[in-house]
């Protein structure tokens, strides 16, 4: 089997390294020609995963035709804001694995990355999601993930990616798996604000617990199964993202406390939570569903509210039964 990995950031590179280390011929497509040439010459992704050697079975390329030639499937590991453009601009693959985490909101309502890819390509899509930091996957530290989609294809993804340090579970709840992976980025932004304000462990535990409740409320209303949000793709991913030094979203929350604005954060790299929170809040307002943590994050990130004022407002909400 030959695999194309589309997207040569940290996550795409880590997945390509994982596959190639198992002897799977893997072509890693980089959007920028200069990056592809550097990957070939240095056998290392110094921009996104410094110190990780590229295995012999990993071949970087800037040519989309070359990347997809003979590939049985394509793994999509691009930022959500670039997903539509990337898929529309590349030759189709027989089927896809979406490793992108994010949300889309428009006239059709809330859509997940796999749903967007499926609509654009009319090909089957499996979502791969979980508490998976690229830095740890690429260094073969123990990791678990979830492959969600059509049962036969999810099992093929399970077999393809599973190994001594990467354990894959299957799920039929693709929508729930993807919603969990998107919402946890919003909650990680909030956790980063708590860290930046030095509000302590009690505050962070309370925020994340209530945030998990919000994830379940949002996710089940959109068709996800409640159990999914208490598994690897929900709670598991939330824990990894909200506490990790690797987490771009948690660090972005800290940066917002220090006065770094949204535009400056986006210039440093994609912060998926900044996009997902817009979709969550827009949907919540349309449906009349309360999402207080997401609304607080939105007010800080997109409306300029002081982070401490936003968190104080959460504490001042009307008392209620848990």
Curated annotation (Swiss-Prot):
Residue sites binding NADPH per the record: 11, 31-32, 101, 134, 248, 270, 272
Pfam families per the UniProt record, alphabetical: NAD_Gly3P_dh_C, NAD_Gly3P_dh_N
Query: Which GO terms fall under biological process for this protein?
Result: carbohydrate metabolic process; glycerol-3-phosphate biosynthetic process; glycerol-3-phosphate catabolic process; glycerophospholipid metabolic process; phospholipid biosynthetic process
Q: Is Ligase among the key words of this record? A: no
Question: What Enzyme Commission number(s) apply to this enzyme?
Answer: 1.1.1.94
Give the matching PROSITE patterns.
NAD_G3PDH
- What keyword terms does UniProt attach to this protein? Cytoplasm, Lipid biosynthesis, Lipid metabolism, NAD, NADP, Nucleotide-binding, Oxidoreductase, Phospholipid biosynthesis, Phospholipid metabolism
Query: Which residues of the sequence carry a binding annotation for sn-glycerol 3-phosphate?
Result: 101, 130, 184, 237, 247-249
Q: Name one GO cellular component term.
A: cytosol
Q: Where in the cell is it found?
A: Cytoplasm
* InterPro entries the record matches: 6-PGluconate_DH-like_C_sf, 6PGD_dom2, G3P_DH_NAD-dep, G3P_DH_NAD-dep_C, G3P_DH_NAD-dep_N, NAD(P)-bd_dom_sf
A Gene Ontology molecular function term for this protein is: NAD binding
Instruction: Name its pathway.
Output: Membrane lipid metabolism; glycerophospholipid metabolism
Disulfide connectivity for this sequence is none
Q: Which residues form the active site?
A: 184
Reaction it catalyzes: sn-glycerol 3-phosphate + NAD(+) = dihydroxyacetone phosphate + NADH + H(+); sn-glycerol 3-phosphate + NADP(+) = dihydroxyacetone phosphate + NADPH + H(+)
Q: Which family does it belong to?
A: Belongs to the NAD-dependent glycerol-3-phosphate dehydrogenase family.
Provide the function of this protein.
Catalyzes the reduction of the glycolytic intermediate dihydroxyacetone phosphate (DHAP) to sn-glycerol 3-phosphate (G3P), the key precursor for phospholipid synthesis.
What this protein is called in its record is Glycerol-3-phosphate dehydrogenase [NAD(P)+]
Gene name in the database record? gpsA
């Amino acid at each position: 089997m030959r695999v194309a990995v589309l997207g040569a950031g940290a996550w795409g590179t880590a997945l390509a390294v994982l596959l190639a280390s198992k002897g799977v011929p893997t072509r890693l497509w980089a959007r920028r020609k200069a990056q592809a040439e550097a990957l070939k010459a240095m056998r290392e992704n110094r921009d996104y995963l410094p110190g990780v050697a590229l295995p012999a079975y990993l071949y970087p390329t800037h040519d989309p035709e070359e990347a997809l030639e003979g590939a049985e499937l394509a793994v999509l590991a691009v930022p959500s804001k670039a997903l539509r453009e990337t898929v529309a601009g590349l030759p189709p693959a027989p089927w896809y694995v979406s490793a992108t985490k994010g949300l889309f909101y428009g006239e059709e309502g809330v859509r997940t990355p796999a749903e967007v890819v499926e609509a654009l390509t009319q090909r089957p899509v499996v979502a791969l999601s979980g508490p998976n930091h690229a830095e740890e996957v690429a260094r073969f530290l123990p990791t678990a993930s979830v492959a969600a989609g059509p049962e036969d294809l999810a099992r093929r993804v399970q077999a393809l990616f599973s190994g001594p340090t990467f354990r894959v579970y299957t799920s039929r709840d693709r929508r729930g798996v993807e919603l969990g992976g998107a919402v946890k980025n919003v909650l990680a932004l909030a956790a980063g604000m708590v860290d930046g304000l030095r509000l302590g462990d009690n505050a962070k535990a309370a925020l994340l617990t209530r945030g998990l409740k919000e994830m379940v409320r949002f996710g089940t209303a959109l068709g996800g199964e409640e159990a999914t949000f208490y598994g690897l793709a929900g709670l598991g991913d939330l824990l990894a993202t909200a506490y990790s030094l690797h987490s771009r979203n948690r660090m972005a929350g800290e940066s917002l406390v220090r006065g770094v604005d949204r535009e400056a954060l986006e210039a440093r790299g994609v912060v998926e939570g900044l996009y997902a929170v817009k979709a969550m809040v827009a949907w919540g307002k349309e449906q009349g569903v309360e999402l207080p943590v997401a609304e607080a994050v939105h007010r800080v990130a997109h409306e300029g509210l002081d982070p401490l004022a936003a968190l104080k407002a959460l504490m001042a909400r009307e008392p209620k039964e848990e």
